[in-house]
């Protein structure tokens, strides 16, 4: 199925729904691909950015979507998180989907031996990459309840399940993120709030540039996946669209791999 065919099949699927996107940094961001897919399906979106460096990019991209809301937010600051959700509530009157595509680790903690990870670096990676999902989900819950439920979707990677060279502290943070998905799904399920993760294969994004040897990872994956190719951001976006839609109403607590099947291989 081509991207155009997918858009045609999902047009209007999310009409009247609202979403909040954390993690757009560049036009190559997976979060932006997800936002584009949700918008094509009819969802009205709000975006956040952290700092002046990213504000221009987010405003330029989000400005191409009609009716979008753009707000500053540092996910390590509870007051800023509250301000974002208060504004989203005031503007949208509730929320249907939360996209969490936020991760960060110090560059020096993404190479060398994991045992040499600094205490500050470990805590920082956990706070931004894992705990933020809990903080955002908690803040989103009252807005979801106004709409009778909702969908939380986060992004993870195989490095949260297996040792991946030069992923180090981020792999540990992703492992915590994936377990958080399960606990949040159990907590929020009675409120009809679903929580799932997408484990995407390696994709050329701005964030990927910080991983040493990333081009080698791409080449290895292309050769060893069952589909003999790397995935595209649009394929991850289609999965997020599915999880945000009523089509996935019975799915929660899952980590869905979109990696051309690499995760099933034993080598």
Regions found by a protein language model. Give the residues of each.
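Short-chain dehydrogenase/reductase
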Residues: 2-121, 210
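Catalytic loop of short-chain dehydrogenase/reductase
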Residues: 23-32, 103-133, 138-141, 145-190, ...
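A glycine/serine/threonine-rich, flexible loop-to-helix segment
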Residues: 59, 169, 190, 202-225, ...
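Short, small/polar-rich loop/turn modules that mediate ligand/substrate recognition or access, typified
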Residues: 189, 194, 251-253
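Conserved SDR Rossmann-fold cofactor-binding beta-strand/turn motif
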Residues: 194-204, 244, 257-259
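A conserved structural motif in NAD(P)-dependent oxidoreductases
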Residues: 225-236, 247
